[in-house]
Amino acid sequence: MLMPKRVKYRRPHRPSLKGKAKGGTQLHFGEYGLQAVEGAWITSQQIEAARVAISRYIRRGGKIWINIFPDHPITRKPAETRMGSGKGAPEYWVAVVKPGKIMFELAGVSEEVAREALRLASHKLPIKTKFVKREVGGEAHES
Protein backbone atom coordinates (compact mmCIF):
# COMPACT_ATOMS: atom_id res chain seq x y z
CA MET A 1 0.00 0.00 0.00
CA LEU A 2 1.04 3.59 -0.56
CA MET A 3 2.21 5.56 2.45
CA PRO A 4 4.94 8.11 3.20
CA LYS A 5 8.35 6.84 4.26
CA ARG A 6 8.39 9.30 7.14
CA VAL A 7 6.21 12.17 8.35
CA LYS A 8 6.82 15.25 10.44
CA TYR A 9 3.78 14.66 12.67
CA ARG A 10 2.47 11.18 13.39
CA ARG A 11 -1.05 12.20 14.43
CA PRO A 12 -2.05 15.47 12.72
CA HIS A 13 -5.51 17.05 12.65
CA ARG A 14 -7.93 15.61 10.14
CA PRO A 15 -7.57 17.04 6.61
CA SER A 16 -10.17 19.49 5.27
CA LEU A 17 -12.31 18.91 2.17
CA LYS A 18 -13.41 22.52 1.66
CA GLY A 19 -13.10 24.25 -1.70
CA LYS A 20 -11.91 23.16 -5.12
CA ALA A 21 -8.54 21.75 -6.16
CA LYS A 22 -5.89 24.47 -6.52
CA GLY A 23 -3.52 22.51 -8.73
CA GLY A 24 -3.55 19.32 -10.74
CA THR A 25 -6.71 20.20 -12.64
CA GLN A 26 -5.13 19.89 -16.12
CA LEU A 27 -3.66 16.87 -17.87
CA HIS A 28 0.14 17.03 -17.56
CA PHE A 29 1.48 13.63 -18.57
CA GLY A 30 -1.08 11.52 -20.44
CA GLU A 31 -3.67 11.94 -23.16
CA TYR A 32 -6.64 10.84 -21.04
CA GLY A 33 -7.50 11.33 -17.38
CA LEU A 34 -9.96 10.64 -14.59
CA GLN A 35 -11.11 13.85 -12.90
CA ALA A 36 -12.88 14.09 -9.53
CA VAL A 37 -16.30 15.79 -9.62
CA GLU A 38 -16.70 15.81 -5.84
CA GLY A 39 -14.34 15.81 -2.88
CA ALA A 40 -13.46 12.88 -0.62
CA TRP A 41 -10.71 11.08 1.24
CA ILE A 42 -9.30 8.32 -0.98
CA THR A 43 -7.53 5.56 0.94
CA SER A 44 -4.34 3.85 -0.20
CA GLN A 45 -6.32 0.61 -0.69
CA GLN A 46 -8.77 2.36 -3.03
CA ILE A 47 -5.92 3.91 -5.06
CA GLU A 48 -4.27 0.49 -5.36
CA ALA A 49 -7.55 -1.20 -6.39
CA ALA A 50 -8.09 1.43 -9.11
CA ARG A 51 -4.49 1.05 -10.31
CA VAL A 52 -4.87 -2.74 -10.56
CA ALA A 53 -8.17 -2.37 -12.44
CA ILE A 54 -6.55 -0.05 -15.00
CA SER A 55 -3.41 -2.21 -15.34
CA ARG A 56 -5.39 -5.40 -15.90
CA TYR A 57 -7.59 -3.82 -18.55
CA ILE A 58 -4.85 -2.15 -20.61
CA ARG A 59 -2.49 -5.14 -20.12
CA ARG A 60 0.99 -4.27 -21.43
CA GLY A 61 0.02 -1.31 -23.61
CA GLY A 62 0.09 2.26 -22.38
CA LYS A 63 1.44 4.10 -19.38
CA ILE A 64 -0.34 5.05 -16.14
CA TRP A 65 0.32 8.08 -13.93
CA ILE A 66 -1.16 8.32 -10.43
CA ASN A 67 -1.41 11.98 -9.41
CA ILE A 68 -2.64 11.50 -5.84
CA PHE A 69 -0.69 10.20 -2.86
CA PRO A 70 -2.06 9.20 0.57
CA ASP A 71 -0.04 11.41 2.91
CA HIS A 72 -2.54 12.00 5.75
CA PRO A 73 -2.84 9.40 8.54
CA ILE A 74 -6.30 8.75 9.96
CA THR A 75 -6.26 7.54 13.56
CA ARG A 76 -8.62 5.15 15.34
CA LYS A 77 -9.00 4.08 18.95
CA PRO A 78 -9.72 0.40 19.63
CA ALA A 79 -13.35 -0.69 20.00
CA GLU A 80 -14.91 -0.37 23.48
CA THR A 81 -12.15 1.89 24.77
CA ARG A 82 -12.92 4.55 27.37
CA MET A 83 -12.62 8.18 26.39
CA GLY A 84 -9.36 9.96 27.08
CA SER A 85 -5.86 8.48 27.32
CA GLY A 86 -4.67 10.27 24.20
CA LYS A 87 -5.28 10.12 20.49
CA GLY A 88 -5.60 6.75 18.75
CA ALA A 89 -2.96 5.03 16.65
CA PRO A 90 -2.73 5.70 12.88
CA GLU A 91 -5.05 3.19 11.19
CA TYR A 92 -4.79 4.02 7.47
CA TRP A 93 -3.62 6.72 5.06
CA VAL A 94 -5.74 8.97 2.86
CA ALA A 95 -5.23 11.36 -0.04
CA VAL A 96 -7.41 14.47 0.09
CA VAL A 97 -9.09 14.81 -3.31
CA LYS A 98 -11.01 18.01 -4.03
CA PRO A 99 -13.35 18.65 -6.99
CA GLY A 100 -11.46 19.17 -10.26
CA LYS A 101 -8.37 17.11 -9.35
CA ILE A 102 -7.01 14.79 -12.06
CA MET A 103 -6.34 11.52 -10.20
CA PHE A 104 -5.16 9.15 -12.93
CA GLU A 105 -3.69 9.75 -16.39
CA LEU A 106 -3.20 7.35 -19.30
CA ALA A 107 -1.23 7.47 -22.54
CA GLY A 108 -0.34 5.05 -25.31
CA VAL A 109 -3.79 3.47 -25.66
CA SER A 110 -6.85 4.20 -27.80
CA GLU A 111 -9.65 6.38 -26.47
CA GLU A 112 -12.06 3.43 -26.17
CA VAL A 113 -9.57 1.41 -24.12
CA ALA A 114 -8.75 4.43 -21.92
CA ARG A 115 -12.43 5.25 -21.38
CA GLU A 116 -13.25 1.67 -20.31
CA ALA A 117 -10.13 1.32 -18.12
CA LEU A 118 -10.88 4.57 -16.29
CA ARG A 119 -14.56 3.59 -15.96
CA LEU A 120 -13.50 0.36 -14.23
CA ALA A 121 -11.15 2.36 -11.98
CA SER A 122 -13.91 4.83 -11.10
CA HIS A 123 -16.03 1.98 -9.72
CA LYS A 124 -13.29 1.34 -7.14
CA LEU A 125 -13.43 4.94 -5.88
CA PRO A 126 -16.02 6.45 -3.50
CA ILE A 127 -16.61 9.62 -5.56
CA LYS A 128 -18.19 10.75 -8.82
CA THR A 129 -15.65 11.18 -11.61
CA LYS A 130 -15.52 12.18 -15.25
CA PHE A 131 -13.35 11.20 -18.21
CA VAL A 132 -11.22 13.99 -19.70
CA LYS A 133 -9.00 13.99 -22.77
CA ARG A 134 -6.30 16.26 -24.14
CA GLU A 135 -7.33 18.60 -26.94
CA VAL A 136 -5.24 19.30 -30.05
CA GLY A 137 -4.03 22.58 -28.52
CA GLY A 138 -2.92 20.81 -25.33
CA GLU A 139 -5.83 21.73 -23.03
CA ALA A 140 -8.03 19.03 -21.51
CA HIS A 141 -11.78 18.90 -21.95
CA GLU A 142 -14.51 16.68 -20.60
CA SER A 143 -16.60 14.32 -22.70
Curated annotation (Swiss-Prot):
Single GO cellular component term: cytosolic large ribosomal subunit
Alphabetized UniProt keyword annotations: Ribonucleoprotein, Ribosomal protein, RNA-binding, rRNA-binding, tRNA-binding
Function of the protein: Binds 23S rRNA and is also seen to make contacts with the A and possibly P site tRNAs.
Keyword NADP among UniProt keywords: no
A Pfam match: Ribosomal_L16
GO BP term, example: translation
Quaternary structure annotation from Swiss-Prot or TrEMBL: Part of the 50S ribosomal subunit.
Region (Disordered): 1-22
Organism (species): Carboxydothermus hydrogenoformans (strain ATCC BAA-161 / DSM 6008 / Z-2901)
SUPFAM superfamilies, alphabetized: Ribosomal protein L16p/L10e
Family, as annotated: Belongs to the universal ribosomal protein uL16 family.
NCBIfam families: rplP_bact (TIGR01164)
Ranges of biased composition (kind: Basic residues): 1-21
Domain of life of the source: Bacteria
Gene Ontology MF term list: rRNA binding; structural constituent of ribosome; tRNA binding
Gene3D superfamilies: Ribosomal protein L10e/L16
Name of the protein in question: Large ribosomal subunit protein uL16
